[in-house]
Amino acid sequence: PILLTRNLSVAKSWIRSHARGTERYGMVAASGAQRLKPYAIDVRFNIRPKDWFLNGPTDTRSSWYLEDVATEFHIQGLELDWVLMTWDADLQYSRSGWKYRKFRASKWMQVKNEERQRYLLNAYRVLLTRARQGMIIFIPEGDSADPTRSKELYDPTFEFLQTLDI
């Protein structure tokens, strides 16, 4: 199954409730997802992939804790049974096609270089194909008090994914 939510707590509960026995689960995000920090998702924190993938459920560094997030660089070529995919405003759906952005200091900047656009799209492709059994996609509600996380940055992507019956 693939589900879609705007509530990170719901996403974490769903992932935990579906994993059985030794099935592995974890949280992933694109390396450019800079504005998920208000949710304690910081892609700049460099996980140790060995600890994240191999350590057990009692180790806070492991994927089991759903605290440290793996990016496309950490997870490429590897799979988890269940994935909590976090989606930021670096890749936004619009009626005219995808909008590609990079966060710099205090605002989102448009990515105009086609090669960098392909890289960003491929980062999301990598992340969206890491789950063996199921996935839940978390897209934030947005915050009208924060122009770097406004609802307008997140709503179009959420609404588009809803049309796909996710």
What do the PLM-derived regions correspond to, one by one?
Residues 65-166:
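C-terminal accessory regions
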Residues 1-97:
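Conserved helicase/translocase motor-coupling segment
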